[in-house]
Structure formats: structure tokens, C-alpha cells
């Protein structure tokens, strides 16, 4: 693997998927100088379209891949990018504590919410499906977590909040 100069600034990319997390540190020329991986537990799947993960498992995986990077490399990180599975959503409080499980991209239980959306959304709107982020949000807000949550966040947004201490900014 090519190496960067020990004084080069590094940029860290964190990729969260459904089965694992990967971190790559690269220099400003795009040379990858370090890579780490961690596994995630499988999503909980149940009847009725349920597909959930616990956000705490995401955080443990992200923390693990960052911790595995050499300390000298971590000190040189100047910017960070996080991506995650699209349409994976959770509710949390102002401090980022999850108030709900994370409904994963393939969770399609929000049929009542998607029926509500279908009454007002254009026929070709992606918000109309039971797996849409809007349908998931309405479903969660109508449950117990909706009474205590202050933020609805996608996977990458929650991880960004955990890393920065700022939630609800994206």
C-alpha cells in the first residue's frame, strides 16, 4: 500500500452498511494509507416488513474502526465524511440517545403512514412507499418514541452527531 508523508493531512471516510463498517484514511492525492473494518450484527427481521438495527451497534462499529487506526494517523485527520444506508431512520433525543430502534432501508411496516402520504403526494413520488423515509418517520412519530424524540436522523446523520456532538444539523 502506498504511504503518505508523515506530515500530510489525512481525510477519513466512514462507510456504514447493513453488515459492517469500513474506514479509509487517504491523503490529499487520494492515496489510501489505512483501512479498517468492523462487522455489525444482522438486522432483526420479523413479519410484517420489520427490519431493525440498534444504533448503538453502529456506534460501536464506528468507534472500533477509528480506534484501530494508528494514533499518529488519527491526529492527522483534517476532514471526515460519513455515508450510510439510504432511508435507514431513527428517532433520538437532544443528546443523541436513540428513542427508537433504527428502521432499516428495507423496513416496510409503515403501511398506514404510506396510505396517508398517498392521499396527498403526487403519484410518482418516492415518498408514497411504506419503505420511504417519510413513511418511517410518521410511523415512528405515532409510536411511543414520538413522545420523547427531538430529532429524526438517518444513519449517517446520527453517526455525524455522535462524532461532533451536534444532532439535527443535516
Positions of predicted regions on the chain:
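Glycine-rich phosphate-binding/catalytic subdomain of phosphoryl-transfer
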Residues: 67-170
Amino acid at each position: 500500500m502506498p504511504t503518505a508523508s508523515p506530515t500530510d493531512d489525512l481525510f477519513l471516510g466512514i462507510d456504514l452498511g447493513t453488515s459492517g463498517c469500513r474506514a479509509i484514511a487517504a491523503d490529499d492525492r487520494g492515496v489510501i494509507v489505512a483501512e479498517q473494518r468492523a462487522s455489525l450484527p444482522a438486522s432483526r427481521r420479523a413479519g410484517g416488513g420489520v427490519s431493525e438495527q440498534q444504533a448503538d451497534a453502529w456506534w460501536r462499529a464506528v468507534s472500533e474502526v477509528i480506534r484501530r487506526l494508528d494514533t499518529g494517523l488519527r491526529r492527522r485527520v483534517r476532514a471526515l465524511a460519513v455515508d450510510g444506508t439510504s432511508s435507514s431512520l431513527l428517532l433520538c433525543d437532544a443528546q443523541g440517545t436513540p428513542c427508537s430502534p433504527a428502521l432499516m432501508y428495507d423496513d416496510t411496516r409503515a403501511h398506514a403512514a404510506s396510505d396517508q402520504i398517498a392521499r396527498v403526494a403526487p403519484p410518482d413520488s418516492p415518498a408514497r412507499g411504506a419503505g420511504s423515509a417519510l413513511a418511517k418517520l410518521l410511523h415512528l412519530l405515532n409510536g411511543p418514541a414520538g413522545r420523547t424524540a427531538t430529532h429524526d436522523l438517518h444513519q449517517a446523520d446520527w453517526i455525524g452527531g455522535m462524532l461532533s456532538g451536534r444532532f439535527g444539523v443535516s
